[in-house]
Amino acid sequence: MAAGPLDRSFADGECVMLCGSNGSGKTTLMKTIAGLIPPMGGSFSVSGKTVMVPTRISKVKGFTVREFIQTSIRTGIAGASDVREAVDRAVDLLRLGHIQNCDISHVSDGEFQKACIATAFTRDCSVMLLDEPTAFLDVANRIMVLSTLKEIASATGTTVLFSTHDIHDGAIYSDSVIDLGGGSLIPPVA
């Protein structure tokens, strides 16, 4: 099911929660914003670079957590010290230091989810889209990830849009909420 019409602007540094039940159109809307699928009608525009972290990425054997995060940085764009610095920052932000040298295929689904999110933090982008970033995470890590997203948005001016099933999960960590009910847009929750 796809979301209904949406007429919305996002401010630099705004952290927006997109919520709704299964099939309400959260992932479809995220993919449309990311340019991965065309809109069914109308148009949209995104200024700057957009990074999307999908709900699920397959674990690849033979990479450490650190190497997995590093693969998100485009070769030739940054020097070795810049790459190291970006990966260090992402590892620190997502509190992955204790597993950074572990094989990515051997970490828990929750730790893998955090590593996937960390890949977004290695890139210079103006818009960050995260499709259910708190999937597979326990309560403490959900809070840590959502508060980190809010901090990143505020500190860097990056617009962050994340989706979730649970409106209570992220409402306190977002500046605004877009609630998709049954595949159609319903008014944002205050």
Model-derived segments and their meaning:
Residues 103-107:
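Conserved ABC ATPase signature
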Residues 164-165:
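H-loop/switch region of ABC-family ATPase nucleotide-binding domains
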Residues 128-132:
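Catalytic Walker B motif of ABC-type/P-loop ATPase nucleotide-binding domains
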Residues 34:
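Helix-to-loop junction immediately C-terminal to a conserved catalytic motif
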Residues 19-21:
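The feature captures the beta-strand-to-loop junction immediately N-terminal to the Walker
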Residues 138:
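ABC-family nucleotide-binding domains
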